[in-house]
A protein has these predicted regions:
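Structural recognition of the beta-strand scaffold that forms the well-ordered cores
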Residues: 124-128, 133, 169-173
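Conserved SGNH/GDSL esterase-like catalytic core that processes O-acyl groups on lipids
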Residues: 32, 99, 138-188
Length: 188
């Protein structure tokens, strides 16, 4: 168990997706990048810097649906779990907005205490794709224009497959840019 304020350390979090550490901060650019944390207490906060308004999905303990939480441009602290029973908890925070819409810099976490994360799955999956893989408009109607409000990468086949298989995963996806014939610009 470590103290109540935690900087980013691999030992205490499982990091998902292609991301990197820079000056003690975790850069989460791609859709479905995220972290698992194991903490003690009733409340957990995360401080992050977002390049634009975006969304996260927060899964607590064995919850599979999660809660959608809006993220505002700039640096802000977000209470991602509160009112939990006193004790040990697992939380997963997933960036569900596409890379071209927003990037994040996770700066710290705050709780009563943190525990070392268990080993990640030996099964590793990587998904490369376009809008279907990125969750483009997945919450909207077929006639709706894509927005960050109706897009959610945690509802895609890539994310759901990785969860069902209990796999470590990475998603490289960008709406409109596919591996063979992009709608605009160069392909992957």
């Amino acid at each position: 168990l470590v103290g109540s304020e935690m900087c980013i350390r691999d030992r205490y979090i499982n990091i998902y997706g292609r991301s990197y550490l820079s000056d003690g901060k975790l850069k989460l650019d791609h859709t479905t990048n995220g972290v698992d944390l194991f903490f003690k207490g009733e409340t957990l906060s995360v401080t992050l810097k977002a390049s634009a308004n975006s969304y996260m999905r927060v899964f607590i303990d064995d919850d599979t649906e999660g809660r959608r939480l809006a993220v505002s441009i700039g640096t802000k602290s977000y209470v991602v779990a509160q009112g939990l029973e006193a004790g040990n908890h697992k939380i997963r925070i997933v960036k569900i907005t596409e890379m071209q819409d927003a990037t994040w810099e996770v700066q710290s976490f705050s709780a009563e205490g943190f525990f070392a994360a268990p080993a990640k799955s030996e099964l590793k999956l990587e998904f490369i794709g376009d809008s279907i893989t990125a969750g483009y408009g997945v919450l909207g109607k077929q006639s709706d224009q894509k927005t960050i409000m109706n897009s959610d990468a945690s509802k895609t086949y890539a994310y759901l497959t990785a969860q069902k298989m209990n796999a470590d995963y990475s998603v490289i996806a960008w709406s409109g840019i596919c591996t063979k014939a992009p709608l605009w610009g160069p392909g992957m």
